[in-house]
Amino acid sequence: MDDEVGMTEGAPPESPSIAGGRVSPFILLCLMGFLGRLSYEMLRSPITSLFAKKIGAPTEVIGLLVASVTITGIFVKLPSGSLADLFGFRRLMQAGLWVKATAPFLYLLVAVWPVLLAVRFYHGLSTALYAPAASAQVAKFYPNERAARLGTYGAAENAGVVLGPVLGAAVLAWSGFSVAFVVSGVIGMLALLVVMPLPKDDPPRAVSKTVGEVTKGLVAGVRQIVGNPAIRLVSLMEATLYAGVGTLQAYLPLYALTVHVSTAQIGLIFGGQGVASIASRPFMGSAADRIGRRPFIIGGVALCAVVLVAIPFVSGFWPLLGFNILFGLGTAMVTPSTTAMIGDLVKQGEFGAAMGVFGSLWDIGHAIGPLIAGVLIAWLGYQIAFTIIAAFIIIALVVFALGSRGSEFGSK
């Protein structure tokens, strides 16, 4: 029996009764993912970069300020995934959403960049706590259509990724940073309310154990997952790709300003990237279930690397929008397949740990990209810096292409 809702493994969970109706937990998860990402992404790009510049942060530090939420994820996602396996998915999701509902209001207190850094570290706890639990629950309930379901859930999250920058830039252009922070906080509170009707977790499996025993079990489970070379290889590929994603999130807004693109248009550029991803992820996930994960990963990563090289060689709203749409298509090809491949590789009952390890390694790349890019941009400029980041992505792609031909990856 399933620990969360008492269902047989692989069957969809029973729909809870909400306000006299029947609402699927999968729909609730997708709505939570949308609202959570909408709140979160409002303050990631372009607002964080522009706000950091407004309060006097140097160029090299802006990458750190954007990446700091991701740095939190590096250290928190790994144990949070394992804790979800032990204590329940819903509990971990609620903890993360409490942070998501409160963190945006703290931005109102920021006047200097070191305080902004502290707030960003705290804000990073939100996704670090709930994201592995949400992905693990989807992967666990739908093993026969894992990539398709994860693609649909990813599309729901990416609806928030699409609208977040657009809404954030629009509110910023209309009424300033303070109102944008408040709007983000209100949306975060709505995400918390949505997750409340989900079926309650069973009593934690570890309540009868001491803290030391629980910790020892977590370490053993995580060590088993980290020790799987196939999981490490897939995570490395996703991490390297997200070094490019993080670079764009941190420095594309600043580059766009140098080529006379307005704040509102910057939001639309990021929105275009998200629309491409949202529209294509479910189809990419379904196709990967049929054809195989590996071709989609290789093709998508290659496309993203080429686009990353090209972006700083163009100027104007329409060229930047076009290249960002292509970048969104590339990530849509990759992420449903990498996440599903992780699900293919793990043992039953270890989905949370696996997604936590995957998320932590993914976040390492997501954080390192902007940090390296900031130094390179200050030293060499946008064109050379973006080309260097793309070169690292291509190197990782070659490693993945050669290493993923083993039997442990199966037919997919």
Model region roles, listed by residue range:
Residues 22-67, 232-233, 237, 242-259:
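Helix-loop boundary and gating motifs at the non-cytosolic
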Residues 103, 114-122, 318-326:
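Paired small-residue
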Residues 186-207, 396-404:
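C-terminal membrane-cytosol helix-exit motif in multi-pass small-molecule transporters
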Residues 91-105, 185, 295-309:
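Structural signature of the two symmetry-related core transmembrane helices
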Residues 8-23, 201-233:
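Juxtamembrane intracellular "pre-TM" segments in multi-pass secondary transporters
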